[in-house]
Each structure stands twice: as C-alpha cells, then as structure tokens.
Amino acid sequence: MRLSECLFRSILFCVSVLTASVSLRAAGTTQVFFSPEGGCTDAIVHEVRSASRSVHVQAFSFTSLPIARALSEASKRGVEVAVIFDQGIVQEPHAAMDILVAAGVPWFLDREHSIAHNKVMVIDDSVVVTGSFNFTTAAEHHNAENVLVIRDVDLATRYQANWKLHRAHSQPGTLPGTLAAPTRSSRRVRRP
C-alpha cells in the first residue's frame, strides 16, 4: 500500500470516528408543534409544569416570559432546574432572566463555543423538548419554527449526557445588573 493511500485511509477512519452518529431504536412517542401561533410555547410550558424531578435547559436565546415563569414555578416546587445559555444572552432584554434569577435558578454561560445554538430541555430524564424554536416571544409569534416533544428514555439519556458535558465547561452566570463587561472606569485601581 502506498503512503498516500495509507494516509487517506487513516484520515477517512479518523473522520468517520469523529463524526459517528448514534443510532437509537425508536421508542416512546413524539409530538410536533409549529409556529407562528402553533402552540409551541404552550407545549413547552405544559412539559415544564409536568416535571417532577428535573428540567435541564440549553438555550441560545431566552426572552419568553411564559417559559421563564414555568421554570421559576418548577424550581419553587422543588424541581431541580438549571439553564445553560449561549454567551450572547447577556445582550438580550433581561425580563425573562430576572424571573429565573428571582427564583434562584442556577444558570451558566457556555463560552466554550463560538455559538451555543442548542434549544433543548431534558425533563425528568425521560422527555426531550427540542427543535428550531428559540425560547423567545418572536419564535412563538413571528418566526417559522418547530418543537418536538419526545418521550424516550434512551434519547433523553443521550441529551442529558450532552447537557452535562456542556455544564462542565460552562461558567456560572452573574446577576443581570452585572452582565455588562466592566467599563473603563470600573477597572481603575484606586491608589492610596
């Protein structure tokens, strides 16, 4: 075998290993919702309100007050709620974030990636909510989006493992009033 052919096969093997997908046998049930005005937010709120143990969220964008309220209520009734946001969240309006902070929901910023574009909830280790739908008002009322609610323990286990992977490299968030980068004057050191 020539060196170039050997090198090609080695590269092909590495690429196939790195891009391997996981095949899961279909089990459980799936519901689909579309927007605008197709019930995506209501479906998500329903699932969060049905949670009894945990709701782990990965969100690129987050301005939906109904979803924020549902997460807050879940936390207050003892459900473990934690949210990983894309670092760009700090530039969005903070009304939904304020609801989470007031409820004591821990949240984290994923700065490991250029964009943390996930839109996922893993609920009670058995339900996955995912799709193109950002957890925003615009996604419900203006955008063409979709949400899948998948009840499948094996799939939820895979998503939960991915959530934990991202949580491991994410940094704890700070209160909304301190999200902005330090100003030049706030970085000055006072000298005695």
State each model region's role.
Residues 1-6:
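N-terminal secretory signal peptides that target proteins for export/translocation
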Residues 9-21:
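Bacterial N-terminal signal peptides
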Residues 24-28:
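Boundary at the C-terminal end of the N-terminal hydrophobic targeting segment
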Residues 31-34, 56-58, 82-85, 108-109, ...:
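Structural recognition of the beta-strand scaffold that forms the well-ordered cores
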Residues 46-106:
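Primarily the HKD phosphodiesterase
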Residues 61-65, 87-91, 113-116, 127-128, ...:
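Solvent-exposed loop/turn segments at secondary-structure junctions
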Residues 95-143:
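Surface-exposed, polar helix/loop patches in the mature regions of secreted/periplasmic/lumenal proteins
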Residues 123, 127-192:
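Signature of lipid phosphatidyltransferase scaffolds
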